[in-house]
Amino acid sequence: GLGDVYKRQDINLSREAIEETESNYALLEAEEIHALIKPRNTFSHKGNFGHALLIAGSYGMAGASILAARACMRSGVGLLTVHAPIRNNDILQISVPEAIIESDASDTYFACPTDTDDYQAVGIGPGIGRSEETEAALLEQLSGCQTPLVLDADALNILANHRHALTTLPKGSILTPHPKELERMVGKCQNSYERLMKACELARTAKVHIILKGAYSAIITPSGKCYFNSTGNPGMATAGSGDVLT
């Protein structure tokens, strides 16, 4: 494995040499993350912060769509539309009253692709299941989508059987697999180093960003550059964490 703990240690190398040396690997720290958060203008409104679409949930898995929708709202999105099967509509409307609920034609699962032109980002996957109808709907949804995507959970499991679709995703798209979901797409790995290398190769070939989730999540760019997020903790090892991270 890659070890249990990542730390930056000063071993008295030349500071100038370190700053001039190129590396594809970097450890993110709190001050670097804080610098990425843009301050909000006093006179801003919800239209300034984008409209996202979330395609999530199936009958018996409404919780996945609720958790993902709540997390999306808390992340600061201006507007959120949730596309869900009819039988999940009531609980979604009650649990996430801020969201706009769009009904799928199916009572129980994602079966009908929806237009994405009016959105700035589209998330697909939490709790959608892997029925034949959902598989067909996902592939059709991806084939015509020009909006950046965040693909997770069952969306990735479906794509593992249709790897050609990974190379046609819109620019700026993000895949957020946990280790097993990644291995379904790239093949079994003997250790975490091999898994990281295969994730970097997938990011380059598919021209997508990949967040390989774990205690030290690896954020991989389409160029293959890798940033490690050290803020994970064992408290996240519980049902629903992945849906929130989407």
Question: Where in this protein do the model-derived segments appear?
Answer:
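Small-residue (G/A/S/T)-rich helix-start motifs and N-terminal tracts that mark the onset
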Residues: 4-149, 157-175, 179-246
